[in-house]
């Protein structure tokens, strides 16, 4: 026994030493050797998703002479979270997402819903501009009109009614309908009501202007257009292996062709890391002091999906429920119409899964590889402070197929098992951020990183993500290129986004003009406001 304890003690000491050595290992890239006469490009975009595609499109229009390079580790762009089958395709506008509104001291706070709705109006303007200029193709190839509904039952009916009463006063949500009438809800979303107990108390809201968006199609079309420009070059099957700063403050990005094994590098003045869940690891390569405050927590997701034509024909709606008390925002259940590559699907979920991967096609060592002496304690602290999230993830991972199907039946009572299959969605990596003097926080939104010298930027985090990518990248431009945005770029930005720097929630006339323009261009459902409508809005705002 003594011998065993001795060996155990030695083993634990060795394990502790190995753990300390691992945590204190260098995480920044070694300096990449370059020659002084190498050409320097203007921009390197790491990752071939919707963020890089959107930023590349902005920059090509603002600075057509800039040399831009894009590197994607897979053999095609838009194959991770941007891919149509890897997300729910929601054009997040705050219309139905009840986790964007919360009741505080008896008052309904709709500020987050207003913010998200404003941002999506920017997205629609950006896409409409690209359609007008033949950058994006037929609108129905990437966006389709699908009304947005919030749906509740039982005790949550009172919450939804209060939410509606608060939201209808804001011009962004004018036209929202509310009902507790089961027959009316059946007209809006037949599958949701067929087979439901008629005694059950239910309520729903509806916004006609809602949409379903294929972000993979947008990404592919934007990149295809970029590829037509002589100053742009896309390299697929190319994994970034290092990012280091040069003495002249430019950057060298090293990459390896995964098909040939050939290693190469490029020098650049500006780096954008838009690699989805992998952005945290890639940002750590830079060695920037301000990058040390970040860590990532990966969460996967699966959906139940059907392409049964009869079911798809009966459901043209995105319908969101309300998350259970104490559950994280990612747990909101919804049953959605999806249009992907010309075919109609119905999706239900998401159900959380756990994986150490930071990308769907990543490595099980991703989480471990991103852990170091700078973030191990913040990660531990966040885990201890978010036991509700841990409990939720455990309960989700333990779910059986029968459990998932029973959740579906709450939203589609007549559902049949044989019509549905599981579809693995993309990986989302929630950001853990530790600022000096403050406790570490788990963030559920998106995080824009800009280095102090503004030469390195990154996009991390999750929802609303892709749906507000034009707004997010516009925000990034403002932080990374403040002089140009205020100066020579300003007229072009106003041309691309007509409401740029204007508050639509306080300007119903401009909002109506913008929605008429984007809805006509993108083929969305919108009824222009009348003088009587403007009078109602003014009266509701004065109350």
Swiss-Prot record:
It catalyses: (S)-malate + a quinone = a quinol + oxaloacetate. Its EC number is 1.1.5.4. Its cofactor is FAD. GO terms for molecular function: 2-hydroxyglutarate dehydrogenase activity; L-malate dehydrogenase (quinone) activity. Pfam families: Mqo (PF06039). Pathway: Carbohydrate metabolism; tricarboxylic acid cycle; oxaloacetate from (S)-malate (quinone route): step 1/1. Keywords: FAD, Flavoprotein, Oxidoreductase, Tricarboxylic acid cycle. Transmembrane segments: none annotated. GO terms for biological process: tricarboxylic acid cycle. Belongs to the MQO family. This is Probable malate:quinone oxidoreductase. It comes from Acinetobacter baylyi (strain ATCC 33305 / BD413 / ADP1).
């Amino acid at each position: 026994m003594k011998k065993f304890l001795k060996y155990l003690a030695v083993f634990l000491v060795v394990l502790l030493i190995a753990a300390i050595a691992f945590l204190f290992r260098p995480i920044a890239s070694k300096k990449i050797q370059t020659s002084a006469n190498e050409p320097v490009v203007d921009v390197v975009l790491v990752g071939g998703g919707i963020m890089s595609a959107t930023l590349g499109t902005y920059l090509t229009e603002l600075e057509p002479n800039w040399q831009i390079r894009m590197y994607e580790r897979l053999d095609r762009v838009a194959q991770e979270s941007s891919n149509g089958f890897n997300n729910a395709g929601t054009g997040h506008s705050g219309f139905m997402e009840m986790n964007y509104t919360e009741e505080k001291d008896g008052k309904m706070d709709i500020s987050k819903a207003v913010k998200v709705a404003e941002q999506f109006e920017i997205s629609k303007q950006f896409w409409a501009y690209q359609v007008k200029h033949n950058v994006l193709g037929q609108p129905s190839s990437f966006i389709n009109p699908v009304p947005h509904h919030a749906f509740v039952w039982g005790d949550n009916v009172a919450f939804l009614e209060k939410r509606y009463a608060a939201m209808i006063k804001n011009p962004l949500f004018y036209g929202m309908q509310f009902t507790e009438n089961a027959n009316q809800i059946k007209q809006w979303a037949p599958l949701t009501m067929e087979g439901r107990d008629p005694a059950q108390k239910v309520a729903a809201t509806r916004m006609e202007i809602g949409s379903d968006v294929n972000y993979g199609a947008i990404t592919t079309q934007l990149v295809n257009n970029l590829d037509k420009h002589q100053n742009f070059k896309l390299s697929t099957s190319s994994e970034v292996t290092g990012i280091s700063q040069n003495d002249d403050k430019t950057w060298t990005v090293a990459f390896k062709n995964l098909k040939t094994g050939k290693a190469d590098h490029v020098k650049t003045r500006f780096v954008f890391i838009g690699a989805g869940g992998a952005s945290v690891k890639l940002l750590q390569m830079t060695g920037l002091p301000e990058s040390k405050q970040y860590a990532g927590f990966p969460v996967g997701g699966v959906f139940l999906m059907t392409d049964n034509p009869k079911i798809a024909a009966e459901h043209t709606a995105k319908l969101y429920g309300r998350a259970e008390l104490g559950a994280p925002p990612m747990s909101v259940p919804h049953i959605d119409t999806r249009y992907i590559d010309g075919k109609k699907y119905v999706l239900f979920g998401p159900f959380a899964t756990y994986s150490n991967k930071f990308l769907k096609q990543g490595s099980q060592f991703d989480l471990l590889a991103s852990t170091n002496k700078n973030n191990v304690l913040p990660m531990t602290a966040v885990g201890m402070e978010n036991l509700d999230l841990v409990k939720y993830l455990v309960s989700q991972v333990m779910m059986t197929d029968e459990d998932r199907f029973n959740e579906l039946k709450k939203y589609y009572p007549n559902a049949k098992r044989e019509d549905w299959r599981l579809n693995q969605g993309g990986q989302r990596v929630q950001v853990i951020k530790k600022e000096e003097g403050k406790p570490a926080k788990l963030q559920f939104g998106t995080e824009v990183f800009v280095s102090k010298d503004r030469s390195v930027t990154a996009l991390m985090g999750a929802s609303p993500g892709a749906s507000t990518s034009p707004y997010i990248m516009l925000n990034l431009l403002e932080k990374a290129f403040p002089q140009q945005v205020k100066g020579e770029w300003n007229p072009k930005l106003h041309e691309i986004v007509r409401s740029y720097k204007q508050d639509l929630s306080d300007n119903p006339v401009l909002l109506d003009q913008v929605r008429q323009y984007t809805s006509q261009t993108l083929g969305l459902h919108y009824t222009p406001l009348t003088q009587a409508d403007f009078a109602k809005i003014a009266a509701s705002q004065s109350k």
